[in-house]
Amino acid sequence: MPATTPFLWFDGTAEEAARLYVSLFPNSTIDEVMGTPGSAMGVRFTLDGAPFIALNGGPMYQFTPAISFQIACADQAEVDHYWEGLTAGGGEPGQCGWLKDRFGLSWQVNPAQLGSYLGGSDAAGAARAQQAMLGMGKLVIGDLRRAYEGEA
């Protein structure tokens, strides 16, 4: 199967965005800056082993929430790390673990176990967890677990 690489269109902030993302994710690197650093045409970078390309394409296209990147976090510390890092500097918190970073790119910052709470064998617990999630911006694993278990 051919390799697939997300190609992200920015309006002059490709290098800044790539540097932010690389600073937040482990096993991440700036692989190539195409053009002059500081006014790059594009940036090839790797986020936790996955290749990406960012292009300074101009104002013609904007990101929408119809496309987002999901981060499956192992624990609350990871949720907090990505949430704080991606909303810093003008990002916008959203509902149910969604956010928009300061470049307009949408992310879902979710605990890895979210699916087991929302789709677990206990239908009433799943409904409680979903209701709890609907009231959250940043997801709080302990609150989701307590809702699922009927302790909230």
Annotate each predicted stretch with a short phrase.
Residues 4-11, 14-15, 41-46, 60-106, 110-114, 120, ...:
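Vicinal oxygen chelate
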Residues 25-29, 90, 137, 148:
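Sec/Tat-exported extracytoplasmic proteins
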Residues 6, 21, 45, 86, ...:
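Terminal peptide-recognition signature
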Residues 8-50:
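Core segments of cupin and vicinal oxygen chelate
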Residues 7, 47-48, 113-116, 123-126, ...:
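Conserved "turn/edge" positions that cap or connect secondary-structure elements
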Residues 121-152:
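C-terminal cap/linker of serine protease catalytic domains
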